[in-house]
Amino acid sequence: MSHANLWIDGNWVQGQGKSWNTCNPVSQQVVWQGNEATAQQVEQACEAARQAFPQWATTSLTDRIAIIERFALLLEQNKEALAKIISQETSKPLWETLTEVQSMVAKVAISIRAYHQRTGKSITEMADGAASLRHRPHGVMAVFGPYNFPGHLPNGHIVPALIAGNVVVFKPSELTPWTAEATVKLWQQAGLPNAVLNLLQGSRETGIALAQSEHIDGVLFTGSASTGYQLHRQLAGAPEKILALEMGGNNALIIEDIDDIDAVVHLAIQSAFISAGQRCTCARRLIIKNGQAGDAFIQRFIEVARDLVIGDWDAEPQPFMGGVISVKAAEALLKAQQNLIDLGARSLLEMKQLRENSALVSPAILDVTAVPDIPDEEYFGPLTCIYRYDDFDEALKLANSTRFGLSVGLVSPKRALFERMLIEARAGIVNWNKPLTGASSAAPFGGVGASGNHRASAFYAADYCAWPMASLESEQLSLPEKLSPGIVL
């Protein structure tokens, strides 16, 4: 039944908007029920955050970090419980959600290091004083979280924002409210002062109200390109607000050379189908060189993909992947598969719904080499398209033939080709003999084009959580030895 599912100004209150529930995508068992925040409750949260900002911003960095490190300790202590919540809400296997919570823990130390390296304080001595650089927090930051990593990805905005001295109003995906609620309760236990972090639950209307609030100073978003573009339009004409958009991709993995076929297949499986294809860096396109080696790779890739273990989050032994986020998402993927076939794609491995009224789907592999005008879309699930090519010029052209620019990868022992990709590829992440889905929180994460607005997250999140303040300083004022022309003193 519904409960107090909003955290506003240090109090748990029930949403006054429409009620809704979330279900496990595979079993359809209801796992959470609650009510949306109304526009009035959105304003209450934003006003409370505005009131809390001055005190939090002037709290010493040492004291802010102490609270944030207590949160990390609580995450570690509650790792399995939170991982089970994420698994029940998303259907991701427990092995994977345990790694997600561990990434949340690690984010704290990494973000502290990034704060000092990217946005700390520095002083340069000068003959007549000093030049200093400091960084100041923006104020009230609206954080919009996605459903695919409902713990880790919002955490990647919230932690650096709080370290820098900002306050946060957090709206998670309406598909994963339970994870957000459980995470915020850990922040509460950590001793975060009232209204420094506020939680709003709801769908599109709640998000629009939050983005339009006059009390916010910035929006930090991870999610689809369509929603990101909508937020960009909403904030048009508001240059005083910082906007960080981390969106999707139509990512390409170029397979040029195949020495160890199973090693390449494993890399491709991890790139295309991990998390049921619901990572923004997943390989939506496999660009494979023509020839017998490429033919053999495709055959082996199909065999391994067909045999992937897909099942419930708590099954033993553990599956490689669970379902996609909802039955609606599964149906959309099946429709996308059929649309591609209707355009002329050749199905090499057909995606099927594995259980009735369930989000469990098998992988799809389609050859679209001879198909003109393939839609430049992000199919957010275990669906990948194969393109064949003859020379590397053609492969690079194919890889760059997208409005997105998140990630691209190369499989080849030839470093010269990788060096060329580093110059010619249009993507924020360029990997070499590594899965596209591999990323490091100690590096920036983001893309160009429809994948983002040049506000990389991860280690560079510190950059959009504070603004630089430059100063020329001198403890004493004295008349210069030489005056400018035209001045008589």
Swiss-Prot record:
Q: In which pathway does it act?
A: Amino-acid degradation; L-arginine degradation via AST pathway; L-glutamate and succinate from L-arginine: step 4/5
Q: What class of enzyme is it?
A: oxidoreductase
The superkingdom listed in its UniProt entry is Bacteria
Q: Does Oxidoreductase count among this protein's keywords?
A: yes
Q: Which NCBIfam families match?
A: arg_catab_astD, PRK09457.1
The keyword Oxidoreductase appears for this protein: yes
This protein is called N-succinylglutamate 5-semialdehyde dehydrogenase
Pfam families in UniProt: Aldedh (PF00171)
Q: Which GO terms describe its biological process?
A: arginine catabolic process to glutamate; arginine catabolic process to succinate
- Tell me the InterPro entries matching this sequence: Ald_DH/histidinol_DH, Ald_DH_C, Ald_DH_CS_CYS, Ald_DH_CS_GLU, Ald_DH_N, Aldehyde_DH_dom, SuccinylGlu_semiald_DH_AstD
Entry's EC annotation: 1.2.1.71
Q: Which gene encodes it?
A: astD
Identify the catalytic residues.
246, 280
Q: Which GO terms describe its molecular function?
A: succinylglutamate-semialdehyde dehydrogenase activity
Q: Which PANTHER family match?
A: ALDEHYDE DEHYDROGENASE-RELATED (PTHR11699)
Residues that bind NAD(+)? 223-228
Keywords in alphabetical order, please: Arginine metabolism, NAD, Oxidoreductase
Its job? Catalyzes the NAD-dependent reduction of succinylglutamate semialdehyde into succinylglutamate.
The similarity annotation says: Belongs to the aldehyde dehydrogenase family. AstD subfamily.
List the catalytic activities from the record: N-succinyl-L-glutamate 5-semialdehyde + NAD(+) + H2O = N-succinyl-L-glutamate + NADH + 2 H(+)
